[in-house]
Amino acid sequence: PVEEDIIRQTLDSESPYYYPNLMLRYQSGDDSMTEEDYHYLYYGYAYQDAYKPLNANSDMDKAILIAQTVDFENPTHESLEKLIAAVNDALVQDPFSPKLLNLLAFAYGALGDSKNEQINYNRMNSILATIEDSGNGLKEGSAWHILMFGHALDLLAAHDRHYGKARVVSRSVEYVPLLEPVRTEEGRIKGYYFDYSRIYRNKPDDYVFKRPRTWQFNNLRPREYK
């Protein structure tokens, strides 16, 4: 991502990527949003006052705890409504969390609300695609750029990649090893690089990072749609 371009485009009220307008379209479930729209939406969030990646998200913790009580094979209407409310609260602080969007897609689908199911499925896939478009994750210089630590883990979970403990390779990049190497078109991959520079900016010297959980609980996987 070119930071100067992102700042210029998202702060200019005459730009098609003016941030308040992009966020309104995203929140309304606009299905006409393009890859470019999502690029400026996701990375432009780093320059919004609401972006506070180091703040604790107690609503996220609450949503995960509630999700762990849901019987995903035979959920009740009450448990799904409770889950949706909790996830929406958590999205206020982390509006692009793939795991939260995945939970919403599941919950709405289980309730028979196909419209909101598809909206959140599209949001999740678009966010994941935006991150993957920022690099290939195979080298420090082509690391995937993310806004929250959890987004990195969710991306790996979405591809069913089981990972080990991350290690720092530079001031802004970490390497996440895979427990089992995978073979792809790029060859044999042992792990991926993630750029956390947006998170590290203005980090207090005494701040201690806490790693988030990913969505791998109760065997809930990213849903697949035709």
Residue spans for each PLM region:
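TPR repeat positional signature
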Residues: 59, 87, 101-104
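Canonical positions in the second alpha-helix
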Residues: 89-90, 124
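TPR/TPR-like (Sel1-like) alpha-helical repeat modules
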Residues: 109-132
